[in-house]
Swiss-Prot record:
It comes from Aspergillus terreus (strain NIH 2624 / FGSC A1156). It is an enzyme of class 4 (lyase). This is Methylthioribulose-1-phosphate dehydratase. Zn(2+) binds at residues 118, 120, 203. Binds 1 zinc ion per subunit. Signal peptide: none annotated. The lineage of its organism: Eukaryota, Fungi, Dikarya, Ascomycota, Pezizomycotina. It catalyses: 5-(methylsulfanyl)-D-ribulose 1-phosphate = 5-methylsulfanyl-2,3-dioxopentyl phosphate + H2O.
């Protein structure tokens, strides 16, 4: 059943805090950083944080560099992914729409993530195009013998990757509507249980981590590796030794 929320009972206190580490403050701060890095231009992309049984999600259609705490949606967790009308919003900005990324974020949280980031990084898009050209559909982005690989986990409780390891990131096909990516994202998660990221062809990437710091630093490390891979390709250098 759809849950009607009025201004009177909108639980605004859930997004009001002087603590800079509160999710309602962290999400706008992260979105501004990501905008300045070119990851979330034109209102694209999104960020979500889970704290206990609450999920804080950036809205749809708000310029990322202008986002404020009062723009943030709050969901109970766990909550159904589908249909959208069954999602348990306990705080909704009345003039905004929930992020179309919501069911994909929920898929990450169901795996135990504490934060999920979606970017439209140009480097992420470019590597999906290069993999498509070189390997065809179903290919993975793979790279080895690069120091920054050490910033990526091997898997839950398995420590971090090493210099000589080969990083493999699955790539899924894009869809006309963001929410329709959910099934293929979940399939990629199931087939690659140690991955913390999934690339979306001609679109961007989803990255998640145990907490905000881990999700952010993993996203930074991956973007560095994607940019490096594009430059290596220009020079005719292989990604995997």
């Amino acid at each position: 059943m759809s849950q009607e929320i009025t201004q009177k009972d909108n639980n605004d206190h859930l997004v009001q805090s002087s603590d800079p580490d509160h999710p309602a403050n962290m999400i706008p701060d992260l979105c501004r950083k990501f905008y300045n890095w070119g990851w979330v231009t034109g209102t694209g992309g999104g960020t979500s944080i889970r704290r206990g049984d609450h999920i804080f999600i950036a809205p749809s259609g708000v310029q990322k560099e202008l986002m404020q705490p009062h723009n943030i949606f709050v969901l109970e967790f766990p909550t159904p992914k589908y249909p959208p009308s069954d999602r348990k919003y306990i705080r909704k900005p009345l003039d905004l729409k929930p992020s179309a990324c919501t069911p994909l974020f929920l898929a990450a949280f169901e795996r135990g993530a504490g934060c999920c980031i979606h970017t439209h990084s140009q480097w992420a898009v470019l590597v999906t195009l290069l993999v498509e050209r070189e390997k065809g559909p179903g290919g993975y982005f793979e790279i080895s013998n690069i120091e920054q690989i050490k910033g990526i986990p091997r898997g839950k409780g398995k420590g971090m990757m090493g210099f000589h390891d080969t990083l493999r990131i699955p790539i899924i096909e894009n869809t006309a509507f963001e929410e329709d990516l959910t099934g293929s994202l979940e399939k990629a998660m199931e087939e690659n249980p140690d991955t913390y990221a999934v690339l979306v062809k001609r679109h961007g990437i989803y990255v998640w981590g145990d907490d905000v710091a881990k999700a952010k630093t993993q996203c930074e490390s991956l973007d560095y590796l994607f940019q490096l891979a594009v430059e290596m390709h220009k020079l005719g250098l292989p990604w995997v030794k």
